[in-house]
Amino acid sequence: MALTMRNPAVKASSRVAPSSRRALRVACQAQKNETASKVGTALAASALAAAVSLSAPSAAMADIAGLTPCSESKAYAKLEKKELKTLEKRLKQYEADSAPAVALKATMERTKARFANYAKAGLLCGNDGLPHLIADPGLALKYGHAGEVFIPTFGFLYVAGYIGYVGRQYLIAVKGEAKPTDKEIIIDVPLATKLAWQGAGWPLAAVQELQRGTLLEKEENITVSPR
């Protein structure tokens, strides 16, 4: 017959166990919160560092990455030497005072002058040794290359507007003729020349016509094709 004996120590430990487990859970939870806080702080610091590094690039890796002044570009100098060397090879095929030799010498001088002017103008060259233009107006202003963008842009707009305005004035002028269609097919050169000279100041003239209300055609005069 087996006898079962009660162990007081076991009973006492069983009474203490629930509070110990609660203390252990509290300690684990505190440790988890502390770890999460450290991880969050580390992630925030990493995000801040990444944002700063992206928003403030170094001068060596500017927004015009890969472009260097042509005067400092090795590829640009190499390209100049290559072109001159090609011309020199062709020059050796002709006599010194022959017409082709004189023409090639003039071409060599123009080539040297062209490369020198590009370098002096401060143009930027890529890895291919060719000058590149900055098409972004903001970057062009930032790096002092605004003329490379704005001058061609305004030049194009002026020429395009000039052609359109003078052509419009010509059509208006021949509209009152007996056969206006013939004037459109066979251009009236004296009239066209006169209007071409008058159209040089077309931006101011267009603004004045807009203020008078004569620049745009009335809606009732605009035909609509059937659909």
From Swiss-Prot:
> Which cysteines are cross-linked by disulfides?
none
- UniProt xrefs under Pfam families: PSI_PsaF
Highest taxon listed in the record's lineage: Eukaryota
Task: Give the location in the cell.
Answer: Plastid, Chloroplast thylakoid lumen
| Family matches, as SUPFAM superfamilies | Subunit III of photosystem I reaction centre, PsaF
Task: Name its GO BP terms in alphabetical order.
Answer: photosynthesis
Keyword presence, Thylakoid: yes
User: One GO term of the cellular component aspect?
Assistant: chloroplast thylakoid lumen
InterPro entries linked to this entry: PSI_PsaF, PSI_PsaF_sf
Task: Report the principal subcellular site.
Answer: plastid
Record keywords, A-Z: Chloroplast, Photosynthesis, Photosystem I, Plastid, Thylakoid, Transit peptide
- Which residues are in coiled coils? none
Transit peptide location on this chain: 1-62
Per the entry, what this protein does is: Probably participates in efficiency of electron transfer from plastocyanin to P700 (or cytochrome c553 in algae and cyanobacteria). This plastocyanin-docking protein contributes to the specific association of plastocyanin to PSI.
**Which family does the record assign?**
Belongs to the PsaF family.
Give the PANTHER family listed for this entry.
PHOTOSYSTEM I REACTION CENTER SUBUNIT III, CHLOROPLASTIC
What is the official name of this protein in its record? Photosystem I reaction center subunit III, chloroplastic
What taxonomic ancestry is recorded?
Eukaryota, Viridiplantae, Chlorophyta, core chlorophytes, Chlorophyceae
